[in-house]
Amino acid sequence: MLVNETKGRIWHGRVRLADTFFKRFRGLMLVRDINYALVFVLPAETRANASIHMFFMLSDIDVIWLDSSRRVVDFKTARKWRVYVPKKAARYIIEGPVGMINVLEVEEGDLIRWSPTEEKNKAVPVKISLPEKISFEGSNGIAIAESVKEIRTEKA
């Protein structure tokens, strides 16, 4: 969710963070259906680092540049196969679907806040070991705690 604090306007779409080099490098290139906003967290507030290119983009996008206090320094609808540099230095860039700027009624100087959407992590298979011999003698079932204890001691 993106919020224009100055105007009280809310964009209810999903928000993802591009806070690593690889995520910033990948951006929205080759994404067919842009139905979320991507917030780029840049290492420093500069004009050069905040420039974007639209090479290999499959559709146009709305772009908002923010300074370190999250105030809008520039915004526009970016067209495919072009390069854009903000008017002033920026620390954050928000890229999203066309129409996002209109919903938020963005103007220079507006304060923008975001709430990243939690992404569900994929399950990762973990190798575990079970006792070689399972015995039901003298018990009412399998003692699961014994196998857990064995797994913990193997890792320790």
From Swiss-Prot:
Signal peptide: none annotated. It comes from the Archaea. Belongs to the UPF0127 family. This is UPF0127 protein TON_0581. It comes from Thermococcus onnurineus (strain NA1).
